[in-house]
A protein has these predicted regions:
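Interaction-mediating elements
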Residues: 1-136, 140-158, 162, 167, ...
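Extracytoplasmic gating/loop element in the C-terminal half of outer-membrane beta-barrel translocons
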Residues: 156, 366-469
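One-face residue pattern on beta-strands with alternating periodicity enriched for small/polar residues
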Residues: 185, 266-268, 312-318, 337, ...
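Outer-membrane beta-barrel transmembrane domain signature
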Residues: 465-488
Length: 529
């Protein structure tokens, strides 16, 4: 048997600074976590000495010695701390070595560093450099160690150790149904193409109902100053109904259903103006055609049968201070984007805003908050284009509801002879809306038994969101304006798999509307929130 006696509780009576503080005593005093009048706390003492050492490193003192010396008054159960500091010698960085990057080129990592070789050691710049490398999203672990140089007391080497994650994915899929027999899908994505740091993606889907061809490439260092360039080209054919459709007791073939054909291309540039801020601007050309067919919602009637062109101009701003793009524990992410189409057949303005905040609750547990807002409006007295609508519901927005199901729903469609018909069986066509509001709250922790592995974590969540429709799209056209707020709560699992971010969530809708389509268990690869 082991007997443990905790002893008396001591209270901090005072905190003093002693030693060489480079004439910056007030700066160091602001870093003290030990509070007089509060019970002694070993964690606060350790946090204070570490904060002092880190602050010394910002002035080139990589090996500063800081010690919290206690002076104990046992009669009064008081303890006074004297923080003794000796900066030691100032050092500069001789070399920066990189280890563990089997695929990624050295230059991809080095260009993110703000601590340079042959420069004074700077703790803030080293931390910023580590975070910038981590935000690339290519690595599961990024560590920077400081090593002394034997015989050179004023020099150090930095060793950057990274652990690479799979950044490429090839997906092959096949599906079978009575309606379309066999459909094939193919996708290839490389976030770090040939170790260059460039993104290259190709998606192909041969389904009769949703045919897609998308090519995208991003060069994050299109210029040596860090200006990025993204080029996208796409061709999509969408037929919303994938089940058997009957008209006059006769099955309608897939090629007889109405379809939306979209094609276009865009180019976008990103110009950094601080370490965490970037301005984006670009332009594109889009052409959308709605071919008449069976089951076309009435909302598409005004745009059917012709090609509708848009020339969207984009302008945006982004700020990213997260400590990691893969599994953030602290920091903030914000992005504002505006899209204006002043020319072409479709004239509209569209704006989106996203905000994320990550707060460490403990060393292992993180609180995460995400909000997404969207707004769109037609210009020149025109309605907002319906195929530019926002959607919500499902993973990535409000979990527990069918993907894209929130907001207005069409109950009527254009029949074969131009007549107005009702969808049978209480079914709807989801229309989306021109206004969007979604909020997500998550508490994230390591999966039991996974240790500090950031690639496997579990989370609890609460989601809230809604979609509002444009009155010009819905007035008198057989629409249910199911635009009330929805909410859900549940638990989930996230895994950074070789195929990409995988998320599995079980959600219980706690606020819903009549007619909502629920999906309590949802699974998807590629969603970030």
């Amino acid at each position: 048997m082991v007997n443990i006696h905790e002893g008396d509780k001591f209270v901090v009576s005072d905190v003093e600074l002693d030693g060489n503080y480079l004439g910056r005593e007030e700066e160091f005093k602001s870093l003290v976590k030990i509070r007089p009048g509060q019970p002694y706390n070993a964690d606060q003492v350790a946090e204070t000495t570490k904060a002092f050492s880190d602050h010394f490193s910002n002035f080139g003192f990589a090996f500063a010695r800081v010690e919290a010396v206690p002076e104990i008054d046992r009669e009064k159960n008081l303890v006074k701390f004297v923080l003794q500091a000796e900066p030691s010698r100032r050092a500069y960085v001789r070399r920066i070595h990189i280890e563990g990057n089997d695929r990624t080129r050295d230059e991809v990592i080095r260009r993110e560093f703000r601590q340079f070789e042959s420069s004074w050691y700077d703790g803030d710049k080293i931390k910023l450099s580590r975070d910038r490398v981590d935000r690339l999203g290519f690595f599961t672990e990024v560590d920077v160690d400081t090593q002394e140089i034997p015989g050179s007391p004023d020099q150090v080497d930095l060793v950057v150790r990274v652990k690479e994650k799979p950044t490429g994915a090839v997906t092959l899929g096949a599906g079978f149904s009575s309606a379309e027999k066999v459909s094939l899908s193919f996708g290839i994505k490389q976030e770090n193409a040939f170790g260059s740091g460039n993104y290259l993606g190709l998606d192909i889907n041969t389904s009769k109902y949703n045919r897609t061809l998308v090519l995208s490439t991003t060069d994050p260092y299109f210029t040596q100053d860090g200006i990025s360039r993204t080029i996208d080209a796409f061709y999509r054919t969408s037929r919303p109904y994938s089940g058997d459709v009957y008209v006059d007791d006769q099955v309608v073939k897939a090629d007889q259903l109405y379809k939306i054909v979209s094609k276009g291309a865009s180019v976008r540039f990103g110009v950094p103006f601080s370490e965490i801020d970037t301005v984006y601007f670009g332009a594109g050309f889009e052409q959308t055609k709605i071919d008449r067919g069976v089951y076309m919602p009435r909302q598409y009637e005004a745009l059917a049968g012709k090609s509708n062109t848009a020339i969207p101009l984009t302008l945006g701003w982004g700020r990213d201070s997260r400590d990691s793009a893969l599994a953030p524990n602290s920091g903030r992410y914000q992005r504002v984007n505006a899209e204006l189409s002043p020319a072409g057949d479709l004239k509209y303005v569209k704006a989106t805003y996203q905000f994320q905040q990550y707060v460490p609750v403990t060393k292992a547990v993180t609180f995460a908050f995400n909000t997404e807002l969207g707004w769109g409006k037609g210009l020149g007295g025109n309605a907002y284009p319906i195929f530019k609508n926002f959607y919500a519901g499902g993973l990535g927005s409000v979990r527990g509801f069918e993907q894209g199901s929130l907001g207005p729903r069409a109950t009527e469609y254009i029949g074969p002879n131009g007549s107005i018909e009702k969808y049978s069986g209480g079914s709807y066509s989801y229309l989306g809306g021109n206004k969007k509001a979604v909020m997500n709250f998550e508490l994230i922790a390591p999966f039991p038994g996974a240790g500090n592995d950031k690639t496997l974590r579990w989370f609890t969540f609460v989601d809230v969101g809604t979609i509002y429709g444009d009155k010009e799209q819905t007035r008198g056209l057989g629409v249910i304006n199911a635009d009330g707020m929805r909410a859900s709560a549940g638990i989930g699992l996230s895994w950074i798999s070789p195929l990409g971010p995988l998320r599995l969530a079980w959600a219980n809708p706690i606020r819903k509307q009549p007619g909502d389509e629920l999906q309590k268990l949802q699974f998807q690869i590629g969603t970030a929130f």
